UniProtKB/Swiss-Prot annotation:
Family affiliation: Belongs to the glycosyltransferase 28 family. MurG subfamily.
The keyword Cell cycle appears for this protein: yes
Gene that this sequence comes from: murG
Keywords: Cell cycle, Cell division, Cell inner membrane, Cell membrane, Cell shape, Cell wall biogenesis/degradation, Glycosyltransferase, Membrane, Peptidoglycan synthesis, Transferase
Any one GO BP annotation for this protein: cell division
CDD domains the record matches: GT28_MurG (cd03785)
Pathway: Cell wall biogenesis; peptidoglycan biosynthesis
Binding site for UDP-N-acetyl-alpha-D-glucosamine: 15-17, 127, 165, 191, 247, 266-271, 292
Keyword Thylakoid: no
GO cellular component term, pick one: plasma membrane
Protein name (record): UDP-N-acetylglucosamine--N-acetylmuramyl-(pentapeptide) pyrophosphoryl-undecaprenol N-acetylglucosamine transferase
Catalytic activity: di-trans,octa-cis-undecaprenyl diphospho-N-acetyl-alpha-D-muramoyl-L-alanyl-D-glutamyl-meso-2,6-diaminopimeloyl-D-alanyl-D-alanine + UDP-N-acetyl-alpha-D-glucosamine = di-trans,octa-cis-undecaprenyl diphospho-[N-acetyl-alpha-D-glucosaminyl-(1->4)]-N-acetyl-alpha-D-muramoyl-L-alanyl-D-glutamyl-meso-2,6-diaminopimeloyl-D-alanyl-D-alanine + UDP + H(+)
Length: 362
């Protein structure tokens, strides 16, 4: 049976950790002849990003419920009912063969609307600890997928990894030059940057450069460029440091790096595994349910990463870890291989095949 003419409604939004894995699946299915439509919210990143990939997007009015004030929580049930009706209208008009929920505000109402409309619902959870929306929807979904083992305890879920871009998967097979060159450290704190990295790294580089040759590519986040550049200059380290507000080409950044200092978002952890890079992971301390620490454990337990909680992070600890890696390039290479060994490289295809199978069953 041909897949041409099949339709999928993709629900993902809010953060890159939801949107980019969903885009990988959407692109794959579009190449198979599927019609793809997106459900999101107008004030989040999907509104800008999804149309750039050529996909139509519909918006519903919904805000996060968790962690808000009392008045918003009291109003939440009415907002949820309204958004379910909006999502149901989109489903009635588009008539998808399957609905794929990958997180974000729109997934909850959209998932309920899919169930009410009798359309197969596939869920994918990117984090090691599921979000509230996916916990609830997992009870009504046709199929539950997850990136990491032991994510769901109340329902049966299939572990498929996190869908990531093909270009990054190919990058993992390239040899790394780790001989006597300067240690190349990629520092990534997300689109907003990470203040703790911005504050500490100028001192870290100054201390390390007295003993080691080191170069740094540092993504500092929006509005932080001038301040961090100045801090490096004050430490006399502006020569070997490339400071950027945002790194658009992560493929180039990963190809360049020997080691990555970063948060432990689900997509980041999966990308580090796929490209085969050692890492120093500092989980975002305010993440819901501390899910970034659980994400990080996948690489830490494999011997592919060091875990440094932000509460104990300081200049000396970062210098110590980077010094260790700079002095033992063989271990650096082994850590990279261990990262690659835990990667799930066909996650996009696995998620897509589940959607295809459910659509064909009707």
């Amino acid at each position: 049976m041909t897949d041409a003419g099949k339709r999928i409604l993709v629900m993902a939004g809010g953060t890159g950790g939801h949107v980019f894995p969903a885009l990988a699946v959407a692109k794959y299915l579009a190449q198979q002849g599927w019609q793809v439509r997106w459900l999101g919210t107008a004030d989040r990143m999907e509104a800008r990003l999804v149309p750039q990939y050529g996909f139509d997007i519909d918006f519903i009015d919904i805000k996060g419920v968790r962690g808000n004030g009392l008045v918003r929580k009291l109003a939440a049930p009415f907002k949820v009912v309204r958004s379910i009706l909006q999502a149901k209208a989109v489903i009635a008009e588009f008539k998808p063969d399957v609905v794929l929920g990958m997180g974000g505000f729109a997934s909850g109402p959209g998932g309920v609307a899919a169930k009410l409309a009798g359309v197969p619902l596939v869920l994918h959870e990117q984090n090691a600890i599921p979000g509230m929306t996916n916990k609830l929807l997992s009870r009504i979904a046709s199929q539950v997928l997850c990136a990491f083992k032991n994510t769901f305890t109340q329902v049966k879920a299939k572990v498929v990894g996190n869908p990531i871009r093909r270009e990054l998967i190919a990058l993992g097979g390239e040899p790394k030059q780790t001989a006597d060159e300067a240690l190349k450290v990629l520092v990534v704190g997300g689109s907003l940057g990470a203040k703790v990295f911005n504050d500490l790294m100028p001192e870290v580089v100054a201390a390390l450069s007295k003993q080691q040759s080191i170069t740094v590519w540092h993504q500092v986040g929006k509005d932080n460029l001038a301040g961090v550049k100045s801090a490096y200059q004050q430490q006399g380290q502006d020569g070997g440091v490339n400071v950027a507000e945002f790194i658009d080409d992560m493929e180039a950044a990963y190809r360049w790096a020997d080691v990555v200092l970063c948060r432990a978002g689900a997509l980041t952890v999966s990308e580090l595994a796929a490209v085969g890079l050692p890492s120093i992971l500092v989980p975002y301390p305010h993440a819901v349910d501390d899910h970034q620490t659980r994400n990080a454990q996948v690489l830490v337990e494999a011997g592919a990463a060091f875990l440094l909680p932000q509460a104990i992070l300081d200049v000396n600890k970062l210098v110590s870890k980077l010094q260790l890696l700079a002095n033992d390039r063989a271990e650096l290479a082994r850590m990279g291989q261990r990262a690659r060994d835990v990667a799930v490289l066909d996650a996009t295809e696995q998620v897509a095949q589940v959607c295809i199978a459910l659509a064909e069953k009707g």
